Amino acid sequence: AEDSRGTQLHRALRKTTKLSLSIRCKGPGASCIRIAYNCCKYSCRNGKCS
């Protein structure tokens, strides 16, 4: 049971990651969280997309 639950969680996580990437991505100079990858085509440096 634990195995399938982990897989479901992983799937849901991947889905929300894709959604946040396409919908809530930010342009250069916007504040960002490195682990959230929420910059469009930019990398997160010092809390800002650059």
From Swiss-Prot:
Q: In which tissues is it expressed?
A: Expressed by the venom duct.
Query: Among the entry's GO cellular component annotations, what is one?
Result: extracellular region
* Source domain of life: Eukaryota
Propeptide residue ranges? 2-24
| Recorded GO MF terms | ion channel regulator activity; toxin activity
Q: Does the keyword Transit peptide apply?
A: no
Q: What is its main location?
A: secreted
Give the range the annotation lists for the signal sequence: 1
Where is this gene product found? Secreted
Q: Which cysteines are joined by disulfide bonds?
A: 25-40, 32-44, 39-49
Q: Keyword annotations for this protein?
A: Disulfide bond, Ion channel impairing toxin, Knottin, Neurotoxin, Secreted, Signal, Toxin
- Family of this protein: Belongs to the conotoxin O1 superfamily.
Task: Print the domain comment field.
Answer: The presence of a 'disulfide through disulfide knot' structurally defines this protein as a knottin.
Protein name (Swiss-Prot/TrEMBL)? Conotoxin Bu13
